[in-house]
From Swiss-Prot:
This is Glutamate racemase. Coiled coil: none annotated. Pfam families: Asp_Glu_race. It is an enzyme of class 5 (isomerase). Gene3D superfamilies: 3.40.50.1860. Provides the (R)-glutamate required for cell wall biosynthesis.
Length: 265
């Protein structure tokens, strides 16, 4: 049995999961967090499910070696491809995945039209289709795949004209179709909230699932008597790409400067 003081592993294809990591640290400040950014293999959204599963297995094994008591897949595409596989491999390990916020969006919409920004992999998945079938029968859902958006966010330049232009091109058709609720279906996209605020009317609700994932992690840790006690926990970072690149982005997206180690698998 893992100890309460053991860390929690959090992974993403890149820096997008930092939006989830921030929610976890806000809700569970005593937890020690391990974050792996698989930047050397980004973007997951354009990779095959088998490729993504293999990456997630490597990272899960690394977290186990580090003594992690739980794992968070802070990536919608990774969850779609790998969460069932990982739960089979590690049946006693608390595992939390991501899914687009279809249920709260369907409840929130007034116009009956919901827009979804997500990766191609997420939107084409059976898991996403099942979410729509379960929660969105009474609303119109318009999906917008966003190739290239993750890569621009990974640069850390959230004010670049190229990023603004690309995002505008993805959002405008959804607004034109009457969307009053917008789902951010990728953990990278919450970093675009300031840009989106200038593109969409004030009455358009923007929904993501970072806070819900943090609450689910708290529930699972509590159910397994694994919630950390005592002093505030720290966060440690690894990347499968150049560590210096992540070091430069952390102050922008994480708002802190931390050391970054190389993850070689």
């Amino acid at each position: 049995m893992a100890e309460r003081s053991a860390p929690v592993g959090v992974m993403d294809s890149g820096v997008g999961g930092l939006s989830v990591l921030a929610e976890i640290q806000r809700l569970l400040p005593n937890e020690t967090l391990l974050y792996v950014a698989d930047c050397g293999h980004i973007p997951y959204g354009e990779k095959s499910p088998d490729y993504i599963r293999e990456r997630c297995r490597h990272i899960a094994e690394f977290f186990h070696e580090q003594g992690a008591k739980a794992m968070v897949l802070a990536c919608n595409t990774a969850t779609v491809a790998a969460v069932a596989d990982l739960r089979e491999l590690y049946p006693t390990w608390p595992l939390v995945g991501m899914e687009p916020a279809v249920k709260p969006a369907a409840a929130a919409t007034r116009s009956g039209v919901v827009g979804v920004l997500a990766t191609t992999g997420t939107l084409q998945s059976a898991k996403f289709a099942a979410l729509l079938d379960r929660f969105a029968n009474d609303v119109q859902v318009i999906t917008q795949p966003c190739p290239g958006l993750v890569e621009l966010i990974e640069t850390g330049d959230l004010a670049s004209p190229a990023l603004r232009q690309m995002l505008q091109g993805y959002v405008q058709p959804l607004l034109a179709a009457g969307c009053d609720t917008l789902i951010l279906g990728c953990t990278h996209y919450p970093f675009l909230r300031p840009l989106l605020a200038g593109m969409v009317p004030n009455d358009v609700a923007i929904i993501d699932t970072g806070a819900a994932v943090a609450r689910q992690l708290r529930r699972l840790l509590g159910a397994n008597d694994l919630l950390a006690k005592g002093p505030a926990g720290a966060a440690r970072f690894w990347t499968s790409a150049d560590p210096e690149a992540l070091r430069k982005i952390l102050p922008v997206l994480w708002h802190k400067s931390d050391d970054v180690q190389s993850f070689a698998l």
